[in-house]
Amino acid sequence: MKLLVLICRLIQKKSVCIRFGNDYDAKCENIVSLQGGIIAWVKCCRYLGVFFVSGRFFKCCFDHAKCSLFSSFNSIFGKVGRFASEEVVISLLKAKCLPCFLYGLEVCPVIMRDKRSFDFYITRLFMKLFRTGSAAIVEQCQKHFDFLPIRYVIDIRTASFIERYLESTNQICMLFKQRAASNLQIIFSNYGNTVCSSNSLKTIINTSFFG
């Protein structure tokens, strides 16, 4: 019995309630357990490393991911700084910083405004690295060092994820296959009528950006 009470207390400390939909801003009473613990309603919560924000529609908050990107980059740049070449710093950025930044984005609703914001943050990092204030120079540096803009990376990762999702035989996943297929076609349609897979999408994007 004591073990059960302890487990319940641990669950309560890690649990919150969040609302999505038309009544997302309606005031709700906190949930009280049999042991007297309170599970509060919140406007933002973290689940599996992804931050959800209460709203009329399901949406995510990427502020933590942006902070993690800057924190990890500044940590690396502060140690290697001007001692390492730009190529080495960018390789470290790809290997150590981007995985944390891109974590879970392929399954999150990312709108174009978010993608532009992500590209802006990467541009700022490149400006710091190459000591320039020109976005045009940053773009040329990205092409030279084989660094694809984040908006394209997200589309490729999302398309690849949806393709794997559509192949799943999980009964719950199958309930949303039609919606997933529709989202995949929307991504493909943004890059022309010849795109039919994530591989062809990647090829077209690389050809278009890198030339």
Q: Where in the sequence are the language-model features?
A:
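Short, conserved micro-motifs composed of acidic
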Residues: 8-44
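Catalytic palm subdomain of template-directed nucleic-acid polymerases
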Residues: 1-5, 20-24, 54-58, 110-112
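Basic, alpha-helical interaction scaffolds
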Residues: 34-109
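Short coil/turn segments at secondary-structure boundaries
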Residues: 12-14, 88-91, 104-111, 136-142, ...
